[in-house]
Structures are given as structure tokens and as C-alpha cells.
């Protein structure tokens, strides 16, 4: 588990832990955090006002308990999965480790790092009946006896069952690993993210069900009600 900022055996983590690997993500066709959470006991998804990840840890809603390689990542957006080695979901008291504002759980994304001495690559593509599709690539190459470069990229079209809904996500993440000495490893990472989507907050409900006569109605201006994200993220 990497959520504690250093690799820790699962048996030594003082919370309940669920780990979803890159292989699991690819086999199940997960495209966002909400897809993973649906298969995790004790955790549910919340709407997030149609423009951000929102998770309910054991009954407590949170939009801030997200981490990236052990560092807080509480920006309000939908997180991509294309460059992840695994997703770690911790449930239980965590104020001592993650701050007194913790809700009783966190989600930590562990990114892929370059692998020295190996060359490999893969391309994945998918689509659904609503017209959505995604393409992702992962390529690792040795750049020397003690260094390697790895590049991950993806593009998503986010069409769904709502006729007026649309969205696009693009991500590019090169990483460099250098073995400085037997005791020192340097990992450098740059990530570019460009997201745009319509903010769909759903339709009104009555008696616990959506009001059918509103299912074709757009609540908001289709040209103005947009979420955009452009980010340049550097890690070392």
C-alpha cells in the first residue's frame, strides 16, 4: 500500500483496504473512480453536482479525500484511470495519518512508473452502445543501463444515455526513472490533462423516482453549463 507515502505491507495498514490493480481496471472496463467504488464494500458514490468525483465512506460524503501517490489531490474534477498502477481504497479512522478533517476513508491513486531494463507496450480501446469510446496507450523503453522512459496517454469521448450530454478527456503522462545509486532512485513525472464536459445534475424526482416527463429536458444552458479543466502536473 502506497497511500501512507511509503510502501507498507497490507497487514500493517490500520484500516480496511481494497486494492484495484491496473489489470482489474482493464478487465472490468472501468473508466472512472465511480465505476471502481460500485464494487467496493462500505463505499458508495454521490452525484458530485455532475462535475466532480464524490464518494460516501461508510455514510459520510466527501469530495476531498483523494490522494495521488500519497499526496493530497482534492481538486474538484473527475479523475482519469489511464496511467494508474493501482487504486487503493482505505476505510476507517484516519485523522492521525491524513488530518483531523478526514471523513473516515481515502482513495489513493498510484501512478505507473518507468521500469529499467524492459521494453513493453500496449494499446486498449473500447466503446459502448451510447457512442462513447476511449483509447489508451502505455509504452516503456530503456534509455540506458540505469534509466528508462514510460509514456501513457488516453482520449475519451464521454457520450451517455442523455441525448444532450457530451464530454471529452485527453491525458498525456511521460515518466522517467533513473537509478542514481543502489540506495537512491529518481522518478520524474509530467502529466497534461485537458477535460471538458457538460455539467448534468440530472432531473427532479418524485416519490423516489425520476419524473419521466422531464427526461428529455435540459436543466441549464447547453452552451454555458460546461466544466473545463486544463492541468500541468509535475512530480518527483
Where are these regions (language model features)?
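Acidic, small-polar-rich N-terminal luminal/periplasmic segments of exported/outer-membrane proteins
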Residues: 1-118
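Short strand-loop junctions, especially beta-strand C-caps/beta-turns
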Residues: 23, 71, 126, 156-158, ...
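Residues in well-ordered beta-strands of folded domains
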Residues: 58, 108-110, 124, 214-219
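Transmembrane beta-barrel architecture of outer-membrane proteins
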Residues: 20, 28, 52, 104, ...
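Acidic/polar loop-and-plug regions of large Gram-negative outer-membrane beta-barrel proteins
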Residues: 156-160, 172-179, 183-236
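Outer-membrane beta-barrel translocator/receptor signature
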Residues: 82-85, 96-174, 180-184
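Short secondary-structure transition/capping segments
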Residues: 57-61, 162-164, 199-200
Amino acid at each position: 500500500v502506497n497511500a501512507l507515502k511509503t510502501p507498507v505491507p497490507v497487514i500493517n495498514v490500520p484500516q480496511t483496504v481494497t486494492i484495484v490493480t491496473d489489470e482489474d481496471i482493464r478487465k472490468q472496463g472501468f473508466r472512472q473512480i465511480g465505476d471502481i467504488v460500485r464494487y467496493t464494500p462500505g463505499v458508495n458514490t454521490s452525484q458530485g453536482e455532475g462535475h466532480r468525483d464524490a464518494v460516501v465512506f461508510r455514510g459520510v460524503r466527501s469530495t476531498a479525500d483523494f490522494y495521488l501517490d500519497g499526496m493530497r489531490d482534492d481538486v474538484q474534477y473527475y479523475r482519469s484511470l489511464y496511467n494508474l498502477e493501482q487504486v487503493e481504497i482505505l476505510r476507517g479512522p484516519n485523522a492521525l495519518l491524513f488530518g483531523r478533517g478526514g471523513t473516515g476513508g481515502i482513495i489513493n491513486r498510484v501512478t505507473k512508473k518507468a521500469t529499467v531494463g524492459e521494453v513493453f507496450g500496449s494499446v486498449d480501446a473500447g466503446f459502448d452502445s451510447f457512442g462513447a469510446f476511449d483509447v489508451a496507450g502505455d509504452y516503456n523503453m530503456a534509455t540506458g543501463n540505469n534509466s528508462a522512459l514510460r509514456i501513457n496517454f488516453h482520449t475519451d469521448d464521454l457520450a451517455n444515455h442523455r441525448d444532450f450530454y457530451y464530454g471529452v478527456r485527453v491525458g498525456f503522462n511521460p515518466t522517467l526513472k533513473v537509478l542514481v545509486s543502489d540506495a537512491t532512485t529518481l522518478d520524474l513525472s509530467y502529466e497534461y490533462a485537458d477535460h471538458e464536459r457538460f455539467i448534468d445534475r440530472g432531473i427532479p424526482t418524485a416519490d423516489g423516482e425520476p419524473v419521466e416527463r422531464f427526461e428529455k429536458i435540459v436543466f441549464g444552458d447547453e452552451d454555458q453549463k460546461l466544466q473545463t479543466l486544463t492541468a500541468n502536473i509535475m512530480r518527483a
